[in-house]
Amino acid sequence: MQILRYTLIALLLMVATIAAAQDLQTQIQECEACHGPGGVSTEDDVPSLAGVDATELTNSLEEFYFYERHCTTTTYRHGDRPKTPLNMCNIANVLSADDRVALGEYFSRQ
């Protein structure tokens, strides 16, 4: 029960941190912390974002936003971010519709 409590607290803190990110570059860095620099993943369980069609990426973020996709809990893989648990539904939920489109467009060009 304690582990669940600490996990939920960590997730809430992570969501609050992501929600505070206002500019696209900060949001890109958040994505790259799991999906790798430039959106090129080196992890078997984390997909690459680079070069994927912008509409497909945006639609995926929309599906996470509306909890229409399974949201596996994972941790940041790259950079100096704390290795606290998080999932794509919570991440997508703090992004505006414009943010989701902008991120899809950015990673499609990588």
Spans of features found by a protein language model:
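N-terminal signal peptide c-region/cleavage motif recognized by signal peptidases
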Residues: 15-18
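Bacterial N-terminal signal peptides that target proteins for export
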Residues: 1-8
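Structural micro-motif
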Residues: 29, 84-85, 100-101
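The canonical Cys-X-X-Cys-His
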Residues: 31-38, 103
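C-terminal capping alpha-helices of c-type cytochrome domains
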Residues: 11, 90-110
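Gly/Gly-Pro-rich "capping" loops immediately C-terminal to redox-active cysteine motifs
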Residues: 39-85, 89-91
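Sequence context surrounding c-type heme c attachment/ligation sites in exported
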Residues: 21-32, 41-42, 50-59, 97
